[in-house]
Amino acid sequence: MEWSEEIGGQVNKDIFTISTFIQSYDNVVDTHYLLPFGDVHYKNPQHHDELWADWCEWAKKKPRSMFIGMGDYMEWFSDLERRGVRSINLHESSEKMMDDFAKETCDEFYSQISFMKGRVLGLLEGNHFYQFQNGMTSTQYLCQKLGCKYLGASGFVRIRFCHTKSNDKMKIDVFVHHGKGASRLVGGSLNTVQQMAECAEADIYLMGHDHKKSIGMSSRLVLTDGRTGINLKEKKVLYARTGSFLKGYEPDKPSYVTKSLLNPSDLGTVKIELTPRTKKVEKNGKFFSEKNYIDIHATL
């Protein structure tokens, strides 16, 4: 394996990133889909193979879709386990054997998500990943294969919607982090996502990590300039925990979920709908088209 121009040398996994993704559109009535995926834990004995395959098949056929990776794509070492492995003085042949197995596993996983190529906003690093002997992580290797941005530990992604036949442009800002916290209740889990808004201004806030799948919405009053003067509008803000594909409870099979008596998760992902719209206002009997905007909705 060689470093790509995009990834460069050894990139610290704890970096914060800023990036832009261009999404073209033809009609202001067509809905675009932002589909986060993460906490897949491919190769874990309790990875839900069938559900993951069904989701990939569904996502492959979804028109005008974009994807963003939320971390923990494969069942690799945790931070503590990686420190333990690094403390062992392995032979070069053992290191190569581990690297070869890791690359093979990454290639297998890439074959399942290769249909996303060209439509991926980027991949976040999680806390489960493999680090090759040259310093590259398994997530960076996937980014190289997909030709997408490595998002590091957290970051901003601005989605620019550009009309194919005019100069009309709109934007959505997404603030993402693999996740922190392990609240047992849905409210506490989603509160952690909402707290992201205390340090960053965005339209959409996303976290994974705790395997929960939940959505929250809020509205904020903002002033905008228009042809008819200053306008008051409500800005939607979306908060989401993005789900998982790892089963927690299976008869006669051990898991940390069973050991800790954690709640089972509703497997799968959230689906975010982004629809370009134009608002018209009336003044003195005439209608004016005010600034275009993106309408945000989400489903489980």
Sequence positions of predicted segments:
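Short glycine- and acidic-rich boundary segments immediately preceding or forming the N-terminal edge
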Residues: 1-21
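Core catalytic region of metal-dependent phosphoesterases/phosphodiesterases
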Residues: 4, 21-22, 28-32, 37, ...
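A short catalytic or substrate-binding loop motif that flags glycine-/basic-rich loops and adjacent residues
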Residues: 11-14, 148-152, 262-266
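Beta-strand-turn-beta hairpins that frame and shape the catalytic cleft
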Residues: 20-35, 158-174, 234-237
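Short, flexible loop/turn elements at secondary-structure junctions
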Residues: 38-44, 161-163, 178-181, 243
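Conserved beta-sheet core of the metallophosphoesterase superfamily
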Residues: 69, 170-278
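C-terminal accessory extensions appended to soluble enzyme cores
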Residues: 85-93, 246, 260-266, 271-300
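Charged, low-complexity C-terminal accessory regions
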Residues: 123-124, 131-133, 137-212, 297-300
